[in-house]
Amino acid sequence: MRVLAMGEVDTSYCPIWGYCEAEPSLDATLVVARDMHATTYGETGLRRIIRLYLPRNLQDMLEYDFILINQPVVQYFPPNSLQDIYLAVAEGGRGALCFMESQYSDIYGPWLETQLYDCFPYDHSKNLKLGAPGDKPFDLEIVRDANLPPLMTPYVPLGIENIKPFGEARPTFERPGATIFARCRTNAFSGAGVTNFPLFISWRYGPGNALVWVTADQFDTSMWRTNDGKERYALDIFTGFIWLSSGWELPDDPIRVHMMRDSFTHLRSRIGLVGNIIEFADSFGANTRQVQTKLGGLQLMDKEAGDLYLDHEFDLAESKMGEAFDLASEIEAESVALKERALTWVYLVEWLTVTSTAALSGVAIWSLMVKRRMFHPVSATRRVGD
């Protein structure tokens, strides 16, 4: 499934690209449309990215299965592209997810004037009445409702609600007719009488009957980035949004699927690491042809395992992943050996260079300063005219 993500989606701080790399069913296109966390694209750079990567017409927009909007600078978008996004959702039935409750009026103001805002099941005006507050820590409360798809409930026995704080959110309020999957509990806004508000909201929208989502926690907090090392099943939840919006059923054994996604994440990380080591060794003249061939085979095994996973052939996929991990270990050992041999020659050449330079310097000093072989006494002279 193709995912179009726009706004604050730079890979230096946003995990969306990593999610789509780890999950075999997802393929992402990023449209960075706001500078954040020390990025320095500038208006010219952002407009160029939008021009290059945002679909130029409705037909191209409909090539995507899911659209994610995370606080872009709406003013930088061509007006027709915003209308195309709206039509892709409202009439084309494409799923979508947004976080737009910025603290800055130049972000949320133009957004609220678009028709696209109407697609999403939250009431931004209630957030503004609180003064458009920033992120605050919250504890998670999952809605138990047998009529809802099991997006998060399978992780309750595993202690997902015991992670405190679960993330950092901004007060978000559902529109009438919306469905709430999880809630935030926090006393950070108790002065305004708000101690409980939705975390994930959804509804069906438009003639296309699109399943559309809102999150109260933007994509650079601990909930999504898991930067404290605690398992929040963020990849599983994110993938669940997209699968449900695309008409896919959630897995019957979500814990097994979670473990497989972890395996894909680790394997692809190792493939990237090995590739970097091989490239490093190659830059020093090492013969990397054989190990590169094996790396190509490893990448093929990763793809085959992904295809089996998508066909729900989990036993075969796990078996293929086991073979892939064995091959990855073999390639890692060979590539490290190549690197060490290449560096041995580098160190040897450096040692010989330093040693020869020191030897030549020593000979020169001995000759000039000790033996004084180049020394000649000054001859006596006489003055002209004597």
Question: What residue ranges belong to the model's regions?
Answer:
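Amphipathic, heptad-repeat alpha-helical segments
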Residues: 250-301
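Aromatic-Pro/Gly-enriched surface loop or interdomain linker
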Residues: 1-66
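Short alpha-beta junction capping motif
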Residues: 60-109, 207-209
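An acidic, glycine-rich "communication" segment
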Residues: 98-186
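Juxtamembrane interface at the cytosolic side of transmembrane helices
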Residues: 360-386
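Juxtamembrane amphipathic/hinge helix adjacent to a transmembrane helix
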Residues: 300, 312-342
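Juxtamembrane/start-of-transmembrane alpha-helix segments at the extracytoplasmic/lumenal side
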Residues: 337-356
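A glycine-centered loop/beta-turn motif at secondary-structure junctions
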Residues: 64, 94-95, 168-249
